[in-house]
Amino acid sequence: MSIHISAKPGEIADKILLPGDPLRAKFIAENFLEDAVCFNEVRNMFGYTGTYKGHRVSVMGTGMGIPSISIYAHELINEYGVKKLIRVGTAGSLNEDVHVRELVLAQAAATNSRMINIDWPEYDLPQIADFDLLDKAYHIAKELNMTTHVGNVLSSDSFYSPKLFSRNLELGQLGVKAVEMEAAALYYLGAKFGVQTLAIMTISDSLVNPEEDTTAEERQNTFTDMMKVGLETLIAE
């Protein structure tokens, strides 16, 4: 048992999906895992362990933002021995050619957060995905005929900021695919503790095409492509 997770030793698999929304974790457990058992309800951050195609897999919500995912990922890695962590979440498109419901695999994640700089004030460290997971996820998505983009994303500390909104659009002109709030922290912890990390996002809205949008219920229950890719990537040899 850790500070924020009530699981006992052995109740969490060494590979895990990390949606931001705890209700999406519940949805994944109920619709994709066999014999799923809930191992955490602390702060309503639901976590489950079950099997997917015969492989033991866990799924747990992380909440929104870099501080929240940092807490849960840190404890999963250091207290429960998790070795593969894949974020499955939503993002806003910054590119004209990246549309709602399409997938983005974050090759790297820039960030305006200063949290990583607490550890490394002298450097701006690049936060990158584990290449093995990235490569597997890309080929799995292609085999499943899913429209998939690979590139940089922005992990932002702010959701509502008119000033950052215009700056984020400029990042899109530099090829940044989308904006979200967690990937950079997950990648940093992967590098720090020597585990494999990847972020797979579904585009839920677009900053360049505002008419493209999805509802909260759709974001919770219908973005199944990234869930399939995430699970297949976790169990791929």
Curated annotation (Swiss-Prot):
It holds the Pfam family PNP_UDP_1. Phosphate binds at G20, R24, R43, R87, V88, G89, T90. Its EC number is 2.4.2.1. Signal peptide: none annotated. The active site is at D205. The record marks R219 as: Important for catalytic activity. A purine D-ribonucleoside binds at H4, E180, M181, E182, S204, D205. Gene3D superfamilies: Nucleoside phosphorylase domain (3.40.50.1580). Keywords: Glycosyltransferase, Transferase. It is an enzyme of class 2 (transferase). Catalyzes the reversible phosphorolytic breakdown of the N-glycosidic bond in the beta-(deoxy)ribonucleoside molecules, with the formation of the corresponding free purine bases and pentose-1-phosphate. Homohexamer; trimer of homodimers. This is Purine nucleoside phosphorylase DeoD-type. It comes from Streptococcus suis (strain 05ZYH33).
